[in-house]
Amino acid sequence: MLMKVSDVMTKNFLAVGPETPIYKVQSLLIRYHLNDVLVTDAENKLLGIVTFSDICCKLLPDYNEFMKDSSYLLNPELIEDRLADIMHLPVKQAMTTNVITTEPDSFAIKAGALMTAKKIKQLPVVENNRLVGVISRTDITWGLLLKYCKQVPD
C-alpha cells in the first residue's frame, strides 16, 4: 500500500495569526531555524505563509526603486529606517496568500513530486479547509527509508 501524506506529516507545526507583527515572526524564524511560518485564523484556516524572502521583499528596495533613488547609496541608514517601519506591520501585509497545499489522504509520493516541481521544501496539509499539519521532502524521505529499508547493511 502506498504511503499517504497523513502517515508521515508533522502534526505539530508553528502558525501565527494575521495580525502578528513581522518582528515576532522574524524572531520565530530565527529562534527555530525556520524558512517560513504558516498564517492561520482562529479556526485554523490557512490564510497564507510568510518566508524570509517575503520579509526581504518588504525590507529591501526593488531594483527599479534602488536605481531611481540614489539616497540608498548615500544614506545606508535608510534601510535601517525602512526596517523599523516594517517590523511592526502585521504579517498579513507580507505573507503569500496563494499557498500550494496537499491533503492527508493524498499519496506522499505525489506531494513529494509537487514539492520538487515547485521547488519548495514543505507543504501545508489541509483538511476541510483547516490546517492539520505540514509535510516536507525530508518527512517523505524518512518515511520511505523506514518503510523500504528495514535492514541497512553495515
Which residue stretches match the model-derived regions?
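Short, charge-rich, low-complexity interaction segments located
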Residues: D62-Y72
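Structured functional modules or segments
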Residues: I120-K121
